[in-house]
Amino acid sequence: MSTASERVRPVVGTMIGDPAGIGPEVAVRALADGAVHTDSIPVLVGSAAAVERALDFTGTKARLRVMRGFEKPSDDPAIIDVIDTGALPDGVLPLGEDTEAAGHATAQWLDELDALARDGSFAATIMGPISTGSLKLAKKLDRVISPTPGESYLVLLTGPLRVAHLTDHMSLRQVIDVISADLVATAVGQLHEAMQSWGIAQPRIAVAGLNPHAMGDEDRLEIAPGIEAARARGIDVEGPIAPDSVFRHCIEGRYDMVLAMFHDQGHIAVKTWGFSGNSVIIMGPPYLHMSVAHGTAYDIVGTGKADAAMMLSAMRTCGRLASGRGFEQA
């Protein structure tokens, strides 16, 4: 088995999230875990002053190296590299509240993250917890990637359960209208290609049915033909499978990924199985892009209570997938 020093570890860029929230705190706490450096070479993007404040809040011992643009990152776990583009010229902001300044800074950091991934400086990226309130004040909400059927998808990961969502924030009535054979076949194909790039040579995909026991018109007339079209391309995909059992099959190792039809179908399964260490993949950009599965937690920022489990999970998973080593076996 190769060691971390023998492997080529990917450089992963993590945007710290809204500077008034717990994002900087969970980032530095996660980086203090040596496992992150086993999987990747991490670089933060955001306010160096906010990161410095987070080190004080959490009691984390590390030295900051501040960069104004991308430079060769340090390989020393005791050093935290931060790319600070000067989006917050006055340093830090008040804690626990939405501000226009925080929204502008968040948007600029997201743009920097995207640019560095597209030019190859970052092999993959992670978005810390953002505030849509701050982004709305700055009129920058468009910087956040919203899952769009046929174009981008939300994938939730928790232990052995991995769930992609055909649709996201959409009413059940709209879901019924949107589901089509072409949409299902497209999503299955995109999942297959993504998982191969993550190191899963022969992905096994299960497609959940829409109706109880997968016995409705939508299952028969749209979902099943979409699965057949994907299977005709050589993809290992099964379904539609009854929604009340398909997630258990994934947990037991029969499948590598489940494609859920709508938001709550997938989210309920994931959050019932596990919550603390969940992470999120946002499929859509031409690179691996992940996020944490929690918000800014304004009510506990600065108290030292912020739990870094989800950020740690995102950083470790991102490193594994970006280097083509697949999902960690649960």
Swiss-Prot record:
MF term (GO), any: 4-hydroxythreonine-4-phosphate dehydrogenase activity
EC number(s) from the headed UniProt entry: 1.1.1.262
KW Metal-binding (keyword) present: yes
SUPFAM superfamilies: Isocitrate/Isopropylmalate dehydrogenase-like
Any one GO biological process: pyridoxine biosynthetic process
Keyword entries, A-Z: Cobalt, Cytoplasm, Magnesium, Metal-binding, NAD, NADP, Oxidoreductase, Plasmid, Pyridoxine biosynthesis, Zinc
Residue ranges the record marks as coiled coil: none
Cofactor(s) for this UniProt protein: Zn(2+); Mg(2+); Co(2+)
Pathway: Cofactor biosynthesis; pyridoxine 5'-phosphate biosynthesis; pyridoxine 5'-phosphate from D-erythrose 4-phosphate: step 4/5
UniProt keyword annotation of Magnesium present: yes
Cofactor note: Binds 1 divalent metal cation per subunit. Can use ions such as Zn(2+), Mg(2+) or Co(2+).
Reactions accelerated catalytically: 4-(phosphooxy)-L-threonine + NAD(+) = 3-amino-2-oxopropyl phosphate + CO2 + NADH
Compartmental location: Cytoplasm
Additional information: The active site is located at the dimer interface.
Function (record text): Catalyzes the NAD(P)-dependent oxidation of 4-(phosphooxy)-L-threonine (HTP) into 2-amino-3-oxo-4-(phosphooxy)butyric acid which spontaneously decarboxylates to form 3-amino-2-oxopropyl phosphate (AHAP).
Oligomer status and interactors: Homodimer.
Name assigned to this protein: Putative 4-hydroxythreonine-4-phosphate dehydrogenase
